[in-house]
Amino acid sequence: MKKFPLHFALVGLALALGCGGAQRPVDRGPITPDRLYPMTEGSVWTYDVETGVGPNVLAISRVVAVRGTSVEIRNDGGQSLTYERRAEGLWEPGSSTWLLRAPIEVGASWDTGSGRTARITAIDERVEVMAGVFEECVRVEETGGDDGRVIATVYCPDVGPTIIESRMTAQLTGMEAAVRGTLRAFALGDEAASYAGADGVDVEEP
């Protein structure tokens, strides 16, 4: 049995509960940060994670509290992150940086701290993962900083983070280390309320 703690900054993630199915998002108007990461209370996302070492592992992230514009997300390792939903986007007060920021258009960018920058590189990706097939997805790539790490996250409207990739090349050896998480299943808000097995779940290795 194996558990994997999720950390979105490094790539985290998964378990089957709700389901996605092949679908195009219902037209709900412009793509906004809130639609790309719908943080309704009780929502849960599960991911299959490839670490490059051993079999895939499972990771889970869920919204555990919503207080006004403040949202707390807890990962299966017990780590919590707090975000604020603002008019401009999704703000992380702990690091004083944006997770997602409007406008959602190719080339838009924002500072993510420690010399790193996030940039929107695509707004029309089609994604096929175990949770389903999704369209009009947005790719955000974060680069810079001393370690040269590149983090790419694909957000799909009315779904959330669907693919999370992190890769880094060792300066001395030139070897690349990579971690990739793909959405296995998800349930939003009331749909997830009846699911009570995510916290602290033990997952059997495939």
Regions found by a protein language model. Give the residues of each.
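Residue-level signal for mature regions of secreted extracellular proteins and peptides
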Residues: 12-13
